[in-house]
Amino acid sequence: MTQTATAPISPESRAERPRSHWDRVATAAEHQHWDAVASGVAEILAADVLERDRGNLDPTTELEPLRSSGLVNLLDPAEFGGGGAVWSTAFRVIRILAAADASLAQILLYHYVNSANIAFSAPESERERFYRATIEGRWLWGDSVNPVDPDLELTPRGDGFELNGLKRFSTGVSSGDAVLVNAVIATGDRAGETLTFVLPRDRAGIEPLGDWDFLGQRQSASGSVRFTGVRVDASEILGALVDEPFATLITPSIQLGFGNLYLGIAQGALAKGRGLTLGRKNSWFLSGVETYAQDPFVRRLYGELVAHTAAAEALADRVGALHDAEVARGAAVTAESRAAQAIEIAKVKIVTDALALDVTTRIYEATGSSSAKSAIGLDLYWRNVRTHSLHDPVDYKKLEVGANYLTGDVQPLSLYT
């Protein structure tokens, strides 16, 4: 995407701006444009996805299409050279990429959420410099945020801090350009406060350990990172974790991203299965038809899986539009409206989790025993969704939705709810 230089925003103009630049819902033209861009990138990624998965190495050059296409800056403000798109557009992009390469789709999803902390966490007066840096550098943002692994220590040092510790599941750090970190201040007047800050990936003392060796999402660069005496400058701090309703939309945003990731994996498995089924030139001897594509039981199975996938897509699209509208409310977002949106997103997560596991398992019933060959790689879809769907237990999403439906209860704010 072409980037053009723009003049800095004056303090007077800045004061009149909405809470974020995501102050509208997506247009059909926006969706169509970025769908096409994502489809082109997905085609590139699909060409060698199996070989890269088997290599089990963190991605490097294969991330370049995400940068050169403009996808890395899709959610950034247009006034600074970004794509100027809104969240539902980003979720559709993740869905399209996940159908081809769920690992790189995960890296991009986390990048979107990580870099969105500029809008959700940083003061308005500081956002422009962060956005200009990430847009001009086409940064990919990884993170060391995993809230169930609070093993980082942030110690005051002069005007800044020193970071030490180990953080597991640090998606994108080993392959990215910037590292988003949440850490609790250990000592001093601000002890106990959680800060959000962004560091350059090449900062001394940041050491990815290369220990990501899992069943699926093998190229998601989600290994552990050790921080040893890492300098954190005051200028690198985005802000402190707060319970302002608008700022806490960061968590529902990534949860809706997960739902679209799973939906995309299901769609990819269906498309792969269709090609395999149409390529089978014989049939089961009791079927009374010439090919498996004509077999009534195969057709029945596809009918069921396609219908369920279409229903999940409709739900994801509806909730994506609701999310655009909720984010666009900015400072008018309330605890109640935020909670209502989180419930809608939990519904998407529940449905797409079950759908993707079902589709990626049962597709073999339509493609037959020959499709179990390692060379075909149909297992990639199941391995990927089975791995990532364990990120946070979907049973607790069911609990959220059920409790809200019965008694109106909502879950307390956290980095998972």
Regions found by a protein language model. Name each.
Residues 39, 264-267, 271, 303-310, ...:
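Generic structural signal for well-ordered, non-transmembrane alpha-helical segments
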Residues 46, 50-53, 310-347, 364-369:
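C-terminal helix-coil-helix/basic helical segment that borders enzyme active sites and/or dimer interfaces
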Residues 365-417:
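Glycine-rich phosphate/cofactor-binding loops in nucleotide/flavin-utilizing enzymes
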Residues 63-65, 288-294, 325-344, 369-387, ...:
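Charge-rich, acidic-biased intrinsically disordered regions
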Residues 60-68, 73-175:
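Glycine-rich flavin
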Residues 169-208:
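A short core secondary-structure module
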Residues 214-310:
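Glycine-rich beta->alpha junctions and the first turn(s) of the following alpha-helix
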Residues 1-109:
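Amphipathic, small/basic residue-rich leader segments at the start of a protein or domain
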